Each structure stands twice: as C-alpha cells, then as structure tokens.
C-alpha cells in the first residue's frame, strides 16, 4: 500500500478564531504556526498547504515575560547607509500591535513559496472585531 500524500483537492481548510488576550507571545505564535502548517491534522504533508485559516483578535493585549517589554528590539533597514531603524516592544505595541505577532509567526513558517502561501492564511486584528464573520470561524483556546 502506498503512503498517503495530501494534495490541494483532498485538503479542506477550516476557519479558526484565536483570542490572544493575556497570552504569551512565543507560545501563542508557535501554536498558530503549527496550525497554519497543518501539523495538527493526521493528513499533514510537508510540501502541501494542509493548514487552516487563523483569525487572531485582541493582539494589543499580548504579554511577554521578564523585561522584554523594554529590552526586546525590532530592527529593519532602509537599504541606505545608516538606515538601520530600531524600535522596542512597548513602542511597537503602541503603534502597530499586530506587527509583533506577524513577525513572530512569519519567522516560524517555512521560507519560500509555501511559507508565503501559509502566511496569507493568517488574519490579525488589534481589537475584538474582525471582518470574517461570514466564514463562521470556530473559537479555539490555545
């Protein structure tokens, strides 16, 4: 008997809703990355997008342990000499709270075309409202 390999025709994604209020950043990000990959399903296949859509709400209420609120730095570069920009966790959470979780999850997904496809299935919102009510997402507790 041949080994089962999932493909786009056999996989049916679900919509899941995650409330990030009071959750720790890294633990939440790793669980969401596994769901996006489809590792929670029996038919997981490494080279196939077998994951589910994930809608995350209340990311403005994420927490981190220790002194990371002030010590954790996020860097990006403009490409020009002297163009390194740095912002700490507290300031980024005040300006763009969804960007923190986006960066954490994106780093945990595969690099390349499959990783970009999986990343598009992630929807992150700072408040408790989201525009995906029509998909009837199931609330899960991580």
From Swiss-Prot:
Keywords: Ribonucleoprotein, Ribosomal protein. The keyword Flavoprotein does not apply. One of its GO terms (molecular function) is mRNA binding. It comes from the Bacteria. Coiled coil: none annotated. Pfam families: Ribosomal_L13 (PF00572). The keyword Ribosomal protein applies. Signal peptide: none annotated. PROSITE patterns: RIBOSOMAL_L13. GO terms for cellular component: cytosolic large ribosomal subunit; ribosome. Transmembrane segments: none annotated. One of its GO terms (biological process) is negative regulation of translation. Part of the 50S ribosomal subunit. HAMAP family: Ribosomal_uL13 (MF_01366). Belongs to the universal ribosomal protein uL13 family. This protein is one of the early assembly proteins of the 50S ribosomal subunit, although it is not seen to bind rRNA by itself. It is important during the early stages of 50S assembly. This is Large ribosomal subunit protein uL13. The lineage of its organism: Bacteria, Pseudomonadati, Pseudomonadota, Gammaproteobacteria, Legionellales.
